Regions:
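Basic, nucleic-acid-binding surfaces and adjacent catalytic neighborhoods in DNA/RNA-processing proteins
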Residues: 1-108
Length: 108
């Protein structure tokens, strides 16, 4: 699903950190196949796309600042950091050729 969300033909403007943020908030594993998610997961995904894009426009786009505290953004850049929600270790790995940060305890 991560590769689909990064495809600019379908989701223009969605960058790597934004896709990680969306999937984390939607509680979806970035390795899931895009055709294999339920309608409930799909609805949650689209809701989080809107939330993250709007939040990024308000915080990052306006002044070039960082997203709000509590976002995955702040914990995704280095190995060994903890999930802001669960305080469990985050995984950083390559998915679809991109560095991906996700929390296996909540992203199924």
């Amino acid at each position: 699903i991560k590769a689909l969300l990064l495809d600019q033909r379908y989701f223009p403007g969605m960058g790597n950190w934004m896709v990680d943020e969306v999937l984390w908030r939607a509680k979806l594993n970035p390795s899931n196949l895009s055709g294999g998610i339920s309608k409930t997961d799909e609805n949650r995904l689209f809701k989080q796309i809107l939330f993250v894009v709007n939040g990024a426009i308000k915080s990052v786009g306006k002044h070039g600042g960082d997203p709000p505290k509590g976002w995955l953004f702040h914990a995704r850049w280095k190995d060994g950091l903890l999930c802001p929600k669960t305080k469990n270790p985050l995984i950083r790995e390559q998915i679809g050729g991109r560095t991906t940060c996700w929390c296996p305890s909540i992203q199924k």
